[in-house]
Design a protein with these regions (language model features):
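Acidic/histidine-rich, surface-exposed loop or edge segments in extracytoplasmic proteins
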Residues: 46-55
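C-terminal segment of classical bacterial N-terminal signal peptides
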Residues: 16-25
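Short, charged beta-turn/beta-strand-edge "cap" motif at the junction between a beta-strand
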Residues: 79-81, 148-151
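Bacterial N-terminal signal peptides that target proteins for export
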Residues: 1-12
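Boundary regions of SH3-family modules and the immediately adjacent low-complexity/disordered segments
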Residues: 29-42, 57, 65, 74, ...
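A structural feature that tracks compact, well-ordered secondary-structure segments
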Residues: 83-86, 146
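Bulky hydrophobic/aromatic "packing anchor" residues in well-ordered structure
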Residues: 52, 121-124
Length: 179
């Protein structure tokens, strides 16, 4: 009997996936936080002094302090008016939502820091791999993102602007498009 129940459940699950109902809908709902916004999602730090706490509230200890406004962080969880964030180094903790902004920024290839002197992320005039390079960004450089088309992001940094491959930045998901 147990074998039949398993087999019936398996057939039902496969049918639900193939018809686009059930499991797919549950996943779409699970991707939204209590705020109604998607989880995870990228935002930036609004203030130049932001305490990262070990839990969602001022009663929790501060584990880190960010000292630069505009840094990109990823919201991975929500609780009341607190957001659990992850930074480009993988550090996680909680911050009050009032210290976050919907503005977008990214860090050029933080995973390439310290890999050598001639490692750069090319910023291009157009969103094409053959387009003219307008700047060479060192890994770890902060850029402000204006839009992404799913493969490329239009970004600005001190004295330069252009298109950067989404695969070479931390601050936009692969395939994510926005203006």
């Amino acid at each position: 009997m147990r074998h039949r129940v398993f087999r019936s459940s398996l057939i039902l699950a496969v049918a639900m996936v193939l018809t686009g109902s059930g499991l797919e809908v549950a996943h779409a709902q699970a991707a939204k936080g209590p705020s109604g916004l998607p989880l995870p999602r990228f935002v930036t730090l609004k203030s130049k002094r932001v305490n990262l706490r070990i839990g969602p509230g001022t009663d929790y200890a501060t584990s880190w302090m960010y000292m630069k406004a505009g840094l990109p962080v990823e919201i991975v969880q929500e609780y009341d008016n607190w957001r659990q964030i992850r930074d480009a180094d993988g550090t996680e903790g909680w911050v009050n939502q009032s210290l976050l902004s919907g503005s977008r920024a990214a860090i050029a290839a933080p995973w390439m820091k310290g890999k050598g002197k001639n490692v750069f992320v090319n910023m291009r005039r157009d969103a094409l791999p053959s387009s003219t390079v307008t700047a060479k960004l060192e890994p770890g450089v902060l850029v402000h993102i204006k839009e992404c088309n799913g493969n490329w992001c239009f970004a600005k940094t001190d004295g330069a602007e252009g298109w950067v491959a989404q695969s070479e930045i931390w601050g936009a998901y692969p395939g994510e498009a926005f203006k």
